UniProtKB/Swiss-Prot annotation:
<protein>
    <recommendedName>
        <fullName>Chitinase-3-like protein 1</fullName>
    </recommendedName>
</protein>
<dbReference type="GO" id="GO:0030246">
    <property type="term" value="F:carbohydrate binding"/>
</dbReference>
<dbReference type="GO" id="GO:0006954">
    <property type="term" value="P:inflammatory response"/>
</dbReference>
<dbReference type="InterPro" id="IPR029070">
    <property type="entry name" value="Chitinase_insertion_sf"/>
</dbReference>
<keyword id="KW-1015">Disulfide bond</keyword>
<feature type="disulfide bond">
    <location>
        <begin position="24"/>
        <end position="49"/>
    </location>
</feature>
<dbReference type="InterPro" id="IPR050314">
    <property type="entry name" value="Glycosyl_Hydrlase_18"/>
</dbReference>
<dbReference type="GO" id="GO:0071356">
    <property type="term" value="P:cellular response to tumor necrosis factor"/>
</dbReference>
<dbReference type="GO" id="GO:0009612">
    <property type="term" value="P:response to mechanical stimulus"/>
</dbReference>
<dbReference type="GO" id="GO:0007250">
    <property type="term" value="P:activation of NF-kappaB-inducing kinase activity"/>
</dbReference>
<keyword id="KW-0963">Cytoplasm</keyword>
<keyword id="KW-0732">Signal</keyword>
<dbReference type="GO" id="GO:0048471">
    <property type="term" value="C:perinuclear region of cytoplasm"/>
</dbReference>
<keyword id="KW-0964">Secreted</keyword>
<dbReference type="GO" id="GO:0070741">
    <property type="term" value="P:response to interleukin-6"/>
</dbReference>
<dbReference type="GO" id="GO:0071347">
    <property type="term" value="P:cellular response to interleukin-1"/>
</dbReference>
<feature type="binding site">
    <location>
        <position position="139"/>
    </location>
    <ligand>
        <name>chitin</name>
    </ligand>
</feature>
Length: 381
């Protein structure tokens, strides 16, 4: 007799038998994608992740604030998931690409504006039912390094002071670059790690059009052709470097992308290192040159040639003059095996709305196939 466990029971097993986190980012602009690309928080599986991070909040008049007209409604949708899974933690992420580094810089470099921000956070999170804050400053520079550390220390102190009997202390996490140059210039890793509950390491976006050649944006290991600074552009180096800088293994959460990076080939040459003319064509739903959601990649794979970069343990696919490097169930399982060997805190997914959340694109009628593959791999003894 075999025991078939429903998804929720598997999650309970995952959460009780191991301390692995599965941290899933949800983006509030995914609601605006057309047709089957549109994703609202009520489409998320309450039993899939241990933590869901809602991206992104804004800062107005130096105070934490909403960024979309209907954020409050979406906050409610997301936090309703906790009625079905009381162990689920939700965090609100502030910052992101469009927020910009300069605005963060101005706010945190001034003690008065920083204090206003810090004191605004807990009431906002409590009002809307969140369990914590995630800082997505992309990215602090050399002049911001000490201010970023101070911000984190002050937020942690405020959360400690704010907690009431019968309530849990608010969580504090940060999304941190895995790029060596950015890490060196903007982060005092050993210091911030002391005060953060966990660190979401962005081990992706390592390769882009600036290289003028094809290459995978989230390879597990260094490639044969990677010399000079390119040798730093892989998951293994990013994780190892963070650990050497003082990040404790039990706070480091390794990022796994549910998106691919695409390029337009310059010639018939289509292997790793082939010349390119620029970004790949935009996806039907995400509409951003050079980036495809996993569900768009599943469409792309029909009629495409699929290859595996064996040493780097990731796939890429070509069709016509289009080249896309991405992750699939096999590669994410290898990444989970790697992070478990390193005794890391768990995996982070950017983003659940880029996975096949409807289960209608990638076959087998499986919802969130990549995130589920990660969850299953984390649960394996």
């Amino acid at each position: 007799m075999t025991l078939q466990l429903p998804g929720f029971a598997v999650l309970m097993l995952l959460q009780s038998c191991s301390a692995y986190k599965l941290v899933c980012y949800y983006t509030n602009w995914s609601q605006y994608r057309e047709g089957n690309g549109s994703c609202f928080p009520d489409a998320l599986d309450h039993s899939l992740c241990t933590h869901i991070i809602y991206s992104f909040a804004n800062i107005s008049n130096n105070k934490l604030s909403t960024s979309e007209w209907n954020d409050v409604t979406l906050y409610g949708m997301l936090n309703t998931l906790k009625t079905r899974n009381p162990r689920l933690k939700t965090l609100l992420s502030v910052g992101g690409w469009s927020f910009g580094s300069e605005r963060f810089s101005r706010i945190v470099s001034n003690a008065k504006s920083r204090k206003t921000f810090v004191q605004s956070v807990a009431p906002f999170l409590r009002t809307y039912g969140f369990d914590g804050l995630d800082l997505a400053w992309l990215y602090p520079g050399p002049k911001d390094k000490q201010h970023f550390t101070t911000l984190i220390k002050e937020l942690k102190a405020e959360f400690t002071k704010e907690v009431q009997p019968g309530t849990e202390k608010l969580l504090l996490s940060a999304a941190v670059s895995a790029g060596k140059v950015t890490l060196d210039s903007g982060y005092d890793v050993a210091q911030i790690a002391q005060h953060l509950d966990f660190i979401n390491l962005m081990t992706y976006d390592f390769h882009g059009t600036w290289r003028h050649t094809t290459g995978h944006h989230s390879p597990l290991f260094r490639g044969q052709q990677d010399t000079g600074p390119d040798r730093f552009s892989n998951v293994d180096y990013g994780v190892g470097y963070m650990l050497r800088l003082g990040a404790p293994t039990n706070k480091l959460v390794m990022g796994i992308p549910t998106f691919g990076k695409s390029f337009t080939l310059a010639s018939s040459e289509n292997q790793v290192g082939a010349p390119i003319t620029g970004s790949g064509l935009p996806g039907r739903y995400t509409k951003e040159k050079g980036t495809l959601a996993y569900y768009e990649i599943c469409d792309f794979l029909r009629g495409a040639e699929v290859h595996r970069i064996l040493g780097q343990q990731v796939p890429f696919a070509t069709k016509g003059n289009q080249w896309v490097g991405y992750d699939d169930p096999e590669s994410v399982k290898n990444k989970v095996k790697y992070l478990k060997n390193k005794q890391l805190a768990g995996a982070m997914v950017w983003a659940v709305d880029l996975d096949d959340f409807r289960g209608s694109f990638c076959g087998h009628n499986v919802h969130f196939p990549l995130t589920n593959a990660i969850k299953e791999a984390l649960a394996v003894a």
